[in-house]
């Protein structure tokens, strides 16, 4: 019997192209397994083989999703596969989003099964769990050894058209799909057993979990910008030189509050990024590419805004848990309200950074302050629940373009900030993207 044919999708890191400096790599293909594909091949135990690997840089995919998907699907089709495996992506936000999008596109457009793997808090999970099977993994590559066999086993079941068990049995993340099944015990007995366990304070598992919805209604728009105090917040890790609060480069446990009173421009001598989730070169050259102090100072001088708040707030969103992001957002919102801030511009960079930023956006919104999220990976911001969103240039320089002359780059940044201010002065009823 012929072996099933499998194509493996990887990012630039696991595809052995390079690190963050190669995140802009366009899609390419290689015959046979690459990197973790070798372990995947072994996990199939001779029933299937990885005939080809498609590799794409995380930033390239995030910034060119539609075109990247076309290229990737075309490359996958050349191998005539029976199954596509993507990742695992663990807690890497851009990678998870790409894995989910590729798997979904394969199922919908090629009509073949696909499997991926992610940490449950990866933003790609919320975006794609209903359309593809996602094996639950650890938050880092240390969990590769456990993830690969589970992905291979589920892939083989899909190939053989065998019945897929529950998430607990197979190891995939619950998809929100309910199915009738025959239980060994009657419903009345199961219900009473559950009630007794609850009364005793023992653990029990409901048979009908309810979906959790956490949407915050948008606040009314700012009526008069010329009298408004605008504050800057970022999950992009911009800190004073030396990172005085020692904010972690990943999975941050804190945020910082820093004075920009009298500061007209963020220079390389005084500000840098502490963020470990994107190439820091461009932000270290000019932190205004992540935190647009320069153009907001000009607008303040011109009377377009009443005042730029004397402090900005920063954390590192890379890998930061949703719980911590919400906690940061609540604390920042309380400080903003106490300071009389009228509106907030919040900027984000990479995938989990965008998730973190959007989680903070919701808490600031919940506190009654209108806020706009400026980010490159708009789908993540929408999935988490930001209301006013402005798409930006690129992950490592959301509010700049190093390829442009300085004056043109600043003009580009100003145009983006003007969009953000327009968003803050526009009434919206729900999520709105200001292109």
Swiss-Prot record:
Pfam families: GRDB. GO terms for cellular component: glycine reductase complex. The keyword Oxidoreductase applies. Keywords: Oxidoreductase, Selenocysteine. GO terms for molecular function: glycine reductase activity. It is an enzyme of class 1 (oxidoreductase). Its EC number is 1.21.4.2. It comes from the Bacteria. It catalyses: acetyl phosphate + [thioredoxin]-disulfide + NH4(+) + H2O = [thioredoxin]-dithiol + glycine + phosphate + H(+). The active site is at residue 350. In the first step of glycine reductase, the substrate is bound to component PB via a Schiff base intermediate. Then the PB-activated substrate is nucleophilically attacked by the selenol anion of component PA to transform it to a carboxymethylated selenoether and the respective amine. By action of component PC, acetyl phosphate is formed, leaving component PA in its oxidized state. Finally component PA becomes reduced by the thioredoxin system to start a new catalytic cycle of reductive deamination. Heterohexamer of two alpha, two beta and two gamma subunits. Component of the glycine reductase complex, together with components A and C. PB is substrate specific. Belongs to the GrdB/GrdF/GrdH family. This is Glycine reductase complex component B subunit gamma. The lineage of its organism: Bacteria, Bacillati, Bacillota, Clostridia, Thermoanaerobacterales.
């Amino acid at each position: 019997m012929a072996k099933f044919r499998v194509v493996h999708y990887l990012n630039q890191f696991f595809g052995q192209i390079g690190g963050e400096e190669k995140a802009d790599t366009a899609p390419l293909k290689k015959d046979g397994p690459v990197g973790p594909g070798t372990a995947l091949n072994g996990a199939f135990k001779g029933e299937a083989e990885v005939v080809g690997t498609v590799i794409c840089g995380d930033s390239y995919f995030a910034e060119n999703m539609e075109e990247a998907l076309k290229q990737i699907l075309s490359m996958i089709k050349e191998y005539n596969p029976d199954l596509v495996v993507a990742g695992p992506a663990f807690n890497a936000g851009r990678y998870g989003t790409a894995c989910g999008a590729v798997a979904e596109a394969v199922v919908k457009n090629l009509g073949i099964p696909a499997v991926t793997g992610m940490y449950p808090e990866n933003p790609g999970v919320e975006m794609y769990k209903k359309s593809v099977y996602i094996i639950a993994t650890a938050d880092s590559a240390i969990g590769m050894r456990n993830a690969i066999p589970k992905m291979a086993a589920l892939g083989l079941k899909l190939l053989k058209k065998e019945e897929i068990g529950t998430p607990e049995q197979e190891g995939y993340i619950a998809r929100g799909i309910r199915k009738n099944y025959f239980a060994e015990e009657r419903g009345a007995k199961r219900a009473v057993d559950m009630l007794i366990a609850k009364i005793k304070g023992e653990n029990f598992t409901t048979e009908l979990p309810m979906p959790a919805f956490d949407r915050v209604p948008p606040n009314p728009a700012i009526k008069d910008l010329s009298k408004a105090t605008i504050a800057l917040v970022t999950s992009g890790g911009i800190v004073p030189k030396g990172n005085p609060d020692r904010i972690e480069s990943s999975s941050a446990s804190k945020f910082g509050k820093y004075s920009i009173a009298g500061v007209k421009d963020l220079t390389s001598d005084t500000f840098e990024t502490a963020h470990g989730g994107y190439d820091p070169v461009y932000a270290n050259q000019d932190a205004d590419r992540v935190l647009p102090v320069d153009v907001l100072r000009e607008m303040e001088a011109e009377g377009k805004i009443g005042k730029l708040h004397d402090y900005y707030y920063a954390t590192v969103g890379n890998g930061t848990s949703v719980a911590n992001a919400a906690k940061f957002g609540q604390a920042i919102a309380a400080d903003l309200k106490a300071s009389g801030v009228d509106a907030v511009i919040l900027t984000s960079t990479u995938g989990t950074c965008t998730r973190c930023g959007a989680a903070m956006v919701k808490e600031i919104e919940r506190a009654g302050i209108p806020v706009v999220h400026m980010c490159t990976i708009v789908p993540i911001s929408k999935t988490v629940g930001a209301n006013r969103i402005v798409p930006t240039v690129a992950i490592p320089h959301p509010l700049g373009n190093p390829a442009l002359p300085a004056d043109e780059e600043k003009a580009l940044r100003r145009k983006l900030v003007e969009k953000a201010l327009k968003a803050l002065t526009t009434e919206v009823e729900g999520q709105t993207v200001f292109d």
